[in-house]
């Protein structure tokens, strides 16, 4: 996910007073099936009908506004600046985060609860410019994407060191689904190119259109005596949404098992994670460490964890197109 840009956008806005390299989109990498067959099982809270609403007051030096942050969790309301670490057993986290640095509180809001006729609520993910004025004078703008994912953010964010290490990515999972199934709607910005806006200076142009995405990894993880976490990739599904569409219900995307590097649909978007896109997880000692993907598992292997994310933009830190929007609902796994 574009978590690094989300994390740094919060800090860029504060200090100006969670990256991935962009991968070209190609339609041949789409793996959508028309129908969702077999036994369907919801991911917990995956109907997005329950939301915890947080009202967080930002610091006076940047305006002192009260921002609304939506969390995928049991219904409730928080009127405080308490850190959020999950609630009610929900496995979901979002790019709506709170940071506290040097006594200054700042938020990013890029995921929203939205009513959906006949279906309760859905999740709305938006790429936007996060803005604030410092002392009412310095106007800072940073591009940030909307993301929802299985895992937990280490809130409050307190520094900009190693932003991906603020995300405990994935959850325990030992099944072998054949596909991920969900409802979705897409609105693309319509811009032929993206922009990069870091909060320092103006926006610059990045070649290529911006696309929302869904990424699913099944991993077999293990930990050594020193607390290092390793993984082999058991299953993979990567999809970029290449056109505007009204709601598509029960869209099914095949999960491919084992070494897929020789498959016709394979490109670097499906590759093992390394470098800036390396995931992190909390080890048995309570420390956040890299999840080092060291190879492809056998196609008949059983995973230990699932990594799943939806993003309104697929680019790197600070990169995207303002207005890109992805709506997601009813996330299930097909067996």
Regions found by a protein language model. Give the residues of each.
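Bacterial Sec-dependent N-terminal signal peptides
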Residues: 1-34
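A generic structural micro-environment signature
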Residues: 7-9, 54, 192
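Generic alpha-helical propensity signal that fires on short helical segments
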Residues: 18-19, 66, 198-202
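Aromatic (Trp/Tyr/Phe) and Gly/Pro-enriched flexible surface segments
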Residues: 24-177, 196, 207-258, 269-334
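Short amphipathic, basic-aromatic surface patches that mediate peripheral association
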Residues: 184-205, 314-317
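Substrate-binding/catalytic groove segments of enzymes
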Residues: 192, 261-268
């Amino acid at each position: 996910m574009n978590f690094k840009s989300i994390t740094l956008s919060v800090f860029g806005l504060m200090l100006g007073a969670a990256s991935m390299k962009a991968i070209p989109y190609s339609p041949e990498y789409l793996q959508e099936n028309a129908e969702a067959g077999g036994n369907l099982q919801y991911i917990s809270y995956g109907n997005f009908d329950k939301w915890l609403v947080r009202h967080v007051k930002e610091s006076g030096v940047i305006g002192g506004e009260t921002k609304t942050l939506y969390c995928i969790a049991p219904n409730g309301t928080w009127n405080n600046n308490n850190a959020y670490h999950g609630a009610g057993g929900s496995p979901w986290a979002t790019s709506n985060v709170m940071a506290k640095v040097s006594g200054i509180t700042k938020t990013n809001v890029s995921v929203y609860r939205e009513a959906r006729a006949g279906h309760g609520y859905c999740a709305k993910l938006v790429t936007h410019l996060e803005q604030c004025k410092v002392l009412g004078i310095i106007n800072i703008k940073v591009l940030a994407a909307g993301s929802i994912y299985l895992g937990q953010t280490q809130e409050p964010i307190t520094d900009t060191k190693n932003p991906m290490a603020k995300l405990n990515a994935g959850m325990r999972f030992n099944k072998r689904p054949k596909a991920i199934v969900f409802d979705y709607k897409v609105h693309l910005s319509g811009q032929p190119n993206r922009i990069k806006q870091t909060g320092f200076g103006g926006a610059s142009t990045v070649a290529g259109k911006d696309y929302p995405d869904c990424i699913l990894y099944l991993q077999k993880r293990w930990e050594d005596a020193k607390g290092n976490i390793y993984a082999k990739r058991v299953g993979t599904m990567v999809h970029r949404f290449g056109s505007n569409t009204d709601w598509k219900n029960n869209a099914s995307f095949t999960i491919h098992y084992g070494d897929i590097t020789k498959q016709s649909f394979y490109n670097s978007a499906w590759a093992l994670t390394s470098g800036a896109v390396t995931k992190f997880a909390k080890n048995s000692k309570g420390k956040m460490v890299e999840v080092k993907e060291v190879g492809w598992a056998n196609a008949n292997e059983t995973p230990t964890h699932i990594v799943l994310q939806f993003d309104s933009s697929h680019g790197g830190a600070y990169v995207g197109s303002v207005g890109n929007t992805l709506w997601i609902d009813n996330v299930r796994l097909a067996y």
